[in-house]
Amino acid sequence: MAQKPDGGAGLRGFQAEASVEDSALLVQTLMEAIQISEAPPTSQATAAASGPNASPQSSQPPTANEKADTEVSAAAARPKTGFKAQNTTTKGPNDYSQARNAKEMPKNQPKVAFKSQNATSKGPHAASDFSHAASTGKSAAKKSEMAFKGQNTTTKAGPSATYNFTQSPSANEMTNNQPKTAKAWNDTTKIPGADAQTQNVNQAKMADVGTSAGISETDGAAAQTSADGSQAQNVESRTIIRGKRTRKINNLNVEENSNGDQRRASLASGNWRSAPVPVTTQNPPGAPPNVLWQTPLAWQNPSGWQNQTARQTPPARQSPPARQTPSAWQNPVAWQNPVIWPNPVIWQNPVIWPNPIVWPGPIVWPNPMAWQSTPGWQSPPSWQAPPSWQSPQDWQGPPDWQLPPDWSMPPDWSFPSDWPFPPDWIPADWPIPPDWQNLRPSPNLRSSPNSRASQNQGPPQPRDVALLQERANKLVKYLMLKDYTKVPIKRSEMLRDIIREYTDVYPEIIERACFVLEKKFGIQLKEIDKEEHLYILISTPESLAGILGTTKDTPKLGLLLVILGIIFMNGNRATEAVLWEALRKMGLRPGVRHPLLGDLRKLLTYEFVKQKYLDYRRVPNSNPPEYEFLWGLRSYHETSKMKVLRFIAEVQKRDPRDWTAQFMEAADEALDALDAAAAEAEARAEARNRMGIGDEAVSGPWSWDDIEFELLTWDEEGDFGDPWSRIPFTFWARYHQNARSRFPQAFTGPIIGPSGTATANFAANFGAIGFFWVE
């Protein structure tokens, strides 16, 4: 029973005032009351054993008659379990420890039901421990069952509680025929103000006395622990208070140790029933029918059972196609060569034959079809049409069907009168039968393989020459403005910016512009790339003295001539390292900005490459990557290898023939260039005669006011945005200068190189640029 905090003083006063005799008498009275209330009246045997500290008044020695009665009742009852007394030692006001003490009884005593408890108090404030041996009532064999309850109550009062009352649970030895076990309740009550929490768990265990060295009993006195591990279980319901959290633990078959951890105990022997197994009415896939399958929680495949594969129905047997009876052939003819048509024949509409046509060979045309001929087919020379074959009346031939030239028509083959011949169907050398005189042979006969192209061209449409010439003059001004940056001009740009709606006659407009450039300014329009259609402006030999002159690009062109010579002398290609090494000998370094040339690296790798003077590419299979320089497309048209070789020989005071390999290569290239120039001049003259381009194209007023500067890009307009600053010469002054110097006797430009006779003028010009050749 829990007491208030001031109740602790009353217990201490009771302990101090009570004498030893009163305490012993109180203990004896309590023991007798417990024995009288619990033991049956017919077979009650009381045995009390006092400890060494007990007083003589607390226990009386039994007489001889009482001992005899005790032995007779013990032999009749045959108790199974002996209880061990507990020895409780109190070491301090807040420290409690219990130790089990089993005392050895004399051998002359056959059975001892209870053992006394030894209570020792240490210190002035030691707690008083009252331990009472529980009495065990011996039940007779006729009793069906007996259950005893032992209560263990531990009460702590106040923060310095020092009293601990412990009662060992009373247990009854059950016989083999008893169906029920004893239950024990452990109630622990704690006052809210207590400092410590104590759990006192006392369990009644069945122990094997025969194996204990401290307890000796006669046969049948102690209960043997069965081999299957069955033992009395203590079912307890505990309430554990930890701070502000309370949880209730129902310990079923759980054994607790002193540290508080839990472990699962072995199940007692006996029949037990598992959870019901759900039953499914559907069979699993592949299972035999009419079988009730049970699906446990963890289903395992029975040994040896395998899922049966679903039976596949064999495909229905298809009947073989009906055998077709071959038609009877009339007059079979052996083919000597396969039928190969020169061009494929594509029918526009399906041809419906009125009657099945039987060919001399093994071919039967059943229904309308898209008939295609095999190219290269030639009819055999001995082939003849069947005499009774006639073409259908409403049959029309394909529009582009071409007959082989040596194919002979059958004599009795008649065409319908209203059958139109497709264009380009009948070759010119094909003989016309006599009965074809009523047809129109002349428009359909072709004279050459390119007759379709000639028909598409047709007669020249009437055009306004003045409008075409006006558009050509605008193109001339446009080309001269675009060529200022030396970037090749694309044909698509000319069509987009100038020609525009005259796209169908753009070849004539371009040719008229070329004629004006040559006659007025001594400039030639060259197509350097036939695939991308790139055009450049180069000077003609008649205007070499005036077109170059001295401009801001003269130093760059001189450096370009030196670079082209280095590339040519190194096998038409020079790596970047070789080129820069040669330029260093001339005082030019890639990291130093030149006052006239600017950034040398940008000039070589960007400007000259964009202008198509040089070709800058990576060396194949180079690791780390290396780059090399080659001649560009513009360099092949503005100069030649022979001119570059003469320039090198002039600088080094040597003969060009000293470099035999380079001289032979340059000579071959010069001959090829002459042949190409002659063929181009002939083709150009023929085209101009066909177009009617003559001196009237350059006659008439010429004005620069209609120059469309808005067509120029930002890069083409220049740094200051002044379109006129891009013109390197005065147009009319240059025109008159070119007119006076039609056939110059000496070359004064460094880009062209020296002529056959070296002049001091060339050396002076090249020396003024500041470049010197270094071996």
From Swiss-Prot:
InterPro entries: MAGE, MAGE_WH1, MAGE_WH2, MHD_dom
Pfam families in the record: MAGE (PF01454)
Induction info: Follitropin decreased expression while lutropin and prolactin stimulated expression.
Ranges occupied by Sequence repeats: 293-298, 299-304, 305-310, 329-334, 335-340, 341-346, 347-352, 353-358, 359-364, 365-370, 371-376, 377-382, 383-388, 389-394, 395-400, 401-406, 407-412, 413-418, 419-424, 425-429, 430-435, 436-441
Biased composition (Polar residues): 52-63, 84-100, 150-180, 223-237, 250-260, 297-330
Residue span, MAGE domain: 468-666
Keywords, alphabetical: Biological rhythms, Cell membrane, Cytoplasm, Membrane, Nucleus, Repeat, Tumor antigen, Ubl conjugation pathway
Gene Ontology terms: cellular component: chromatin; cytosol; nucleus; plasma membrane; protein-containing complex
Chain intervals for the UniProt region annotation (22 X 6 AA tandem repeats of W-[PQ]-X-P-X-X): 293-441
Top-rank lineage group of the source organism: Eukaryota
Segments of skewed composition (Low complexity): 39-50, 375-406, 437-452
Function statement: Involved in the apoptotic response after nerve growth factor (NGF) binding in neuronal cells. Inhibits cell cycle progression, and facilitates NGFR-mediated apoptosis. May act as a regulator of the function of DLX family members. May enhance ubiquitin ligase activity of RING-type zinc finger-containing E3 ubiquitin-protein ligases. Proposed to act through recruitment and/or stabilization of the Ubl-conjugating enzyme (E2) at the E3:substrate complex. Plays a role in the circadian rhythm regulation.
Subunit annotation: Interacts with DLX5, DLX7 and MSX2 and forms homomultimers. Interacts with UNC5A. Interacts with TRIM28 and PJA1. Interacts with NGFR/p75NTR and RORA.
Annotated protein name in UniProt: Melanoma-associated antigen D1
